[in-house]
């Protein structure tokens, strides 16, 4: 069974920390990921070279890897250039996730970046982090292996929107036009939501904040106790 089939109907856990987040420490994240795998996590979504290296020392599950890197001339920061792709290939991550929005990139445009990746690394699986339908259609046409909704709510035109609103209407609309496997990421806080999304025919789901970002989990509880 290939990896894409293997992750169908799977709970993918995102365990990341950057900048001044309190858990931004490779040792801490490696222990968290070890605990996640003990709990049954089958696939992890991870960022940053030093973190991925350390985590790979203690777990042996498929990894969706990305590098968050900010450049002065672009809003794109998830694996924005071929340099970050090269680093992730060196780490031997199973799937590389990159921003697939139509926004201006710091180096090559998305079309040429994908051509470069497919020439250098023809067997590398790629996940498109999208924000809207147009991103997803373009990513599918460019040959991405997986289409993810990671960036919905994080771009100017999708601000204040998410994957859950209006009874998952965005995911339903996406399913009508995308034939590649769709990965739902963002805004999923309960197992019930996860089940309902998978029942739409979505390939698999990514949950991060609701499981691995302690400050947001506490905030969620406090907000719901009011």
From Swiss-Prot:
GO terms for molecular function: N-acylglucosamine-6-phosphate 2-epimerase activity. One of its GO terms (biological process) is carbohydrate metabolic process. Keywords: Carbohydrate metabolism, Isomerase. Pfam families: NanE. Signal peptide: none annotated. Its EC number is 5.1.3.9. Pathway: Amino-sugar metabolism; N-acetylneuraminate degradation; D-fructose 6-phosphate from N-acetylneuraminate: step 3/5. The keyword Signal does not apply. One of its GO terms (cellular component) is cytosol. SUPFAM superfamilies: Ribulose-phoshate binding barrel (SSF51366). InterPro entries: Aldolase_TIM, NanE, RibuloseP-bd_barrel. It catalyses: an N-acyl-D-glucosamine 6-phosphate = an N-acyl-D-mannosamine 6-phosphate. HAMAP family: ManNAc6P_epimer. Belongs to the NanE family. NCBIfam families: PRK01130.1. Converts N-acetylmannosamine-6-phosphate (ManNAc-6-P) to N-acetylglucosamine-6-phosphate (GlcNAc-6-P). This is Putative N-acetylmannosamine-6-phosphate 2-epimerase. It comes from Mycoplasma mycoides subsp. mycoides SC (strain CCUG 32753 / NCTC 10114 / PG1). The gene is nanE.
